[in-house]
Amino acid sequence: MSEEQNLRPVYDDDQPGEDTYKRGAIYKQTRSRKADYEDGENSEKRQKPNDTDNGPTAVVTDLSNEKKETRSKDKDESVALAVDADGNPIPQEVRLPKRKVAVMIGYCGTGYHGMQYNPPNDTIEKELFEAFVRAGAISKANSTDLKKNGFQRAARTDKGVHAGGNVISLKLIIEDPEVKEKINNELPDQIRVWDISRVNKAFDCRKMCSSRWYEYLLPTYSLIGPKPSTYLYNEIEASKKEIPNVIQDDVESAQFWEAFSTEAESKFTKEELEEIAAFVMPKDSFDENNETYQKSKAFKKLEAEHKRAYRISKERLDRFRSALKQYEGTFNFHNFTLGKDFNDPSAKRFMKQITVSEPFVIGEAKTEWVSIKIHGQSFMLHQIRKMISMATLITRCFSPLERIRQAYGQEKINIPKAPALGLLLEAPVYDGYNTRLQEFGYDPIDFSKYQSEMDTFKMKHIYDKIYLEEVNENVFNAFFSYIDTFNPSYNISQEQQQLKGQELQQPSQAVELVTEDLEQKAPSDPTPSDEKGKKPQRPIFDFLTARGIQLQD
């Protein structure tokens, strides 16, 4: 058995259940273990003499030395049973004490399949565990099983998601005063250990975490309204004519797209623009030197540059902030995750505070960004990405802000996930439990002591990679362009084929992810079903238009 196969992951379901802490439960477990131990000793006393014994006197002997020898022998055999990945016995080490600790870490998730150990994939936990072993913080005898070390995590991050601060708890050998430096020397530069702090034996970094801070970085051009002639734009305009005074006119977006149209007409002839509009990317192989393809590619590049030059107005930014404020409080977020029903009590979550920074310009592309910080008690799968997506769509489409509160209702709504690229875990918070730690004589778990180091790390290994990947892959541009051109009445439009082929020479993860959310139904089915098939899901497009809003009312 290989080391990777033998190294068992620790899942959140491995946590002790609530019944473990009910009155009398621990006593019963202790009594049961004691009885097993006593039976093991008494069985030796109850053994009958065999045929070679000379009567009863053979039984009446002092077994204390015999027991010690047996235990010593068993101990030696247990040490010999510890083997490496190739099945060879691991040489006996000097046994050093293990201490329960909280390890404060930060990492860039690019290139990893998430936080949690998941063989054979490369994950953050896999890198950490192997570094602990190489640095001597975990003995070789315990290097094949995470559970032997009581491994737990405060927050599990998905593939590609980063963390400025996260916490894991486990038992480590920390006698060496330079153990933190040795561990960091064994880790890649994109994973850092900020501190290793002693905690009491009952500490559980996930259960004792009172809340979590997340950050999401968003380019401000994502808040521009849909491009004229796209499906979503046409639906909004048509519904406004049918039902006036429900959705406001978006003057700023109209001026933005008019300016781009003027710029495009100065770069391309009318015939070239018509040729570009009619071009469809071939499904099979094609000649990249094709003249029309090259013109289409140049057109998309011009559009991307025009978006990056956009600077958000105060009015639109305030509208976006107001949209995000609709999440503050305790609400039923069943539409903002997967596999949750309206009646599921676990769908109710408490969002403490959401803030949006002032815009800032980063990189050679001079793209303008905002930082969104979300402080919540706990979060469900994809919840933050769906929250960002809904608030952004409400801002782009000028739909009433109340639509977000209506999404907490019983109706199922298909909300696409915003790209994972901009998401990072800022830090878990231990306000309540830190008081108890200090009472036990331990230092509180506090990331503020390492804020300067963390900021430097985030800028070099997280923020810069996010900015660079957005420029190279056009992740947010692809995501919102695909949403704007998606037609629910059939699987893929000509505009979408252009997006997949021209704007991105290789389809990015953003397009693939939004496709998963939007293409959940047959072309003729106007109400897609959720993954359980229990209730129909309402398309997000219908939810945003004046027609859909009137139906809701």
Curated annotation (Swiss-Prot):
Cofactor note: Binds 1 zinc ion per subunit.
Keyword Nucleus: yes
InterPro entries cross-referenced by the UniProt entry: PsdUridine_synth_cat_dom_sf, PsdUridine_synth_TruA, PsdUridine_synth_TruA_a/b_dom, PsdUridine_synth_TruA_C, PUS1/PUS2-like, TruA/RsuA/RluB/E/F_N
Catalysed transformations (reactions): a uridine in tRNA = a pseudouridine in tRNA; uridine in snRNA = pseudouridine in snRNA; a uridine in mRNA = a pseudouridine in mRNA
GO aspect biological process, one term: mRNA pseudouridine synthesis
Sequence ranges of Basic and acidic residues compositional bias: 33-51, 64-78
Keyword Nucleus: yes
Organism domain of life: Eukaryota
Entry's EC annotation: 5.4.99.-
GO cellular component, as recorded: nucleus
Main location class: nucleus
GO MF annotation: an example: RNA binding
Listed Pfam families: PseudoU_synth_1
Record keywords, A-Z: Isomerase, Metal-binding, mRNA processing, Nucleus, tRNA processing, Zinc
Location within or outside the cell: Nucleus
Enzyme class: isomerase
Catalytic residues as annotated in Swiss-Prot or TrEMBL: 158 (nucleophile)
Region (Disordered): 1-78, 517-539
Cofactor: Zn(2+)
UniProt-listed Gene3D superfamilies: Pseudouridine synthase I, catalytic domain, C-terminal subdomain (3.30.70.660), Pseudouridine synthase I, catalytic domain, N-terminal subdomain (3.30.70.580)
Xref: NCBIfam families: hisT_truA
Purpose: Formation of pseudouridine at positions 27 and 28 in the anticodon stem and loop of transfer RNAs; at positions 34 and 36 of intron-containing precursor tRNA(Ile) and at position 35 in the intron-containing tRNA(Tyr). Catalyzes pseudouridylation at position 44 in U2 snRNA. Also catalyzes pseudouridylation of mRNAs.
Family: Belongs to the tRNA pseudouridine synthase TruA family.
Protein name according to UniProt: tRNA pseudouridine synthase 1
